[in-house]
C-alpha cells in the first residue's frame, strides 16, 4: 500500500463534495476542484471529517496515482483553508517591479520591461519596488507563477543580480584573478 496514499486527508474547516470522479473543495480562501483519475476511488467520511483514497489493485501505475491523488487533495484542502504564499526579491541596481491591473511588469536590465499577466486565482502584492508576494489557494498555480517570475532574470553567479526566492542562497563565483606579473614578462 502507498505510504502516502493510505493516510486519510483531514478536511478541517473545508466543505467537500465528491461526485462522479469530481472532487470540489471550498473554504475561506477560495474554491478548487479536481477531476480524479477513473482508477482511483475517493470517499468522503463525514463522521471523521476526512477524505479516503483507495485504488483497485497493486499495479505500478495505480500505486503511483494513489499517492499522487492523496497529495493533490491534501494540497487543495490546505490551500482553501490557509492558502499558499511564495515571496521573491529583486536584486540589482535599477531592477524593480510594478503591478498595473492584472499585469506584473518587471524592469530587470533588458531593453524593454517584461510584462507577465497575473493568472486568475493568484494575488500578487508588492512590498516596496523589490519584493513580490504571490499568494492563492492553488499550490501548483502559485508555484508556477512564482517560477515564471524568477525565470525572467535568474540570479547570475558573479554579482547575484536577478530575481530570487526570499531566503534563496545564490553561490557567488570568484571573478578572474588579477594576472600580476606573469603575462608581461618575456
PLM feature segments, named:
Residues 2-66, 70-147, 151-186:
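N-terminal intrinsically disordered, cationic/polar leader segments
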